[in-house]
Amino acid sequence: MILILLISFYGVCNARNIRTTSYHVTIHKKAGNHKKLKIILLADLHLGYNIGCSQMKQMVMKVNQQSPDLIVVAGDIFDNEYDALDDPDQLVKIFRQLKSQYGVYAVYGNHDIDEKILAGFTFGSGREKKVSDPRMDEFVKRAGMKLLRDESVVLIKASISMEDQMLRK
């Protein structure tokens, strides 16, 4: 029992730490006149029970310091339940402070849709149609993110494409 409590405590504390990792990727394709494109990838935000306004303010500040060309939010924006957000309107204002030349694009992950999850893992047949909470959809829109659902977007004669397996019919 003590081990479980210690592991849970470690997980909660670790979730609040913002980690950055830099990668330099060479792609042998033309992207307009761009020689370099700085893309910031945010993943597994899990807004709600453990992550709120304070952590997001720090994250937005770190992202904006990098002067990205593009910001991509790669799923698990929410921690399963919209009602877990401590102050949705304030979080929207914080997200709207993200700055990039080509905008902020997002896809949903398994924690952003109506799916059976136990201890962070998805279970079930996988055959059911996955739907998102309309309040989450509205939050993402108000936050200034373009939600991609099995679609691609052309940026500077280069394209970004993100498949959303969770919402595929």
Give residue ranges: language-model regions.
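Alpha-helical transmembrane signal-anchor/signal-peptide segments
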Residues: A15-K30
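Soluble catalytic domains of enzymes that build or remodel membrane lipids, polysaccharides, and related
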Residues: N33-K169
